[in-house]
Amino acid sequence: MCGRYVSPEQASIERAWKIDRTSSNPFPRRFNVQPTTDVPVLRLDGRALVLEAARWGLIPHWWKQDKPPSFTINARLEEAADKPMWREPLRGSRCLLPAEGWYEWQALAGGKQPHYIRRSDGRPACFAGLMSIWRDRPSCAILTRAAAGPVAQVHDRMPVVLADAAHAGWLDPALKDATRYAREHALADEFTHYPVSKRVNDARNEGPDLVEPLRP
């Protein structure tokens, strides 16, 4: 799964993608993004690439209860086409979540050790995402897959990080088989990771020191 990540500031997002329109206040750089908070997402509106805020934790448009559903921050790629929660967004409401990297917790004999995972080339690790609008509020989920490459040393799941050339295709409303597309265009071996401070465990902690390598 992916339960915490690092979100780039808006200026970095605008340098990496040709944004046509923004519909939110400027996004700051965040080093400890947690579920249910608003995060930057990229989506298509017609032909325009829009940067906007969405709640991390998808709420389907048909949700009847006042309390949002639990456990909707991640959608398993291998199940998304069949599950009612994900099926409709996968078909017609896909998005991208810009990220610098993410955290995973490695199970060790003495407890869980957080690791920071990022692309080896330093480029943004853009997550494939799903969106929905509930009571006029956008929300989103990150697609995940079985871990591969170096990430498998830390955890058994990882976000679907799309290759740069696949971003436009993922957002294209004409895409027919999104599951296959994500599987074929997901990065696997292009990552590095290292242990970081357990300060990241507390969602109240924030700052660049969270991604500093843990000193022996």
Task: Put a short name on every predicted segment.
Residues 1-216:
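Short linear sequence motif anchored by a di-proline
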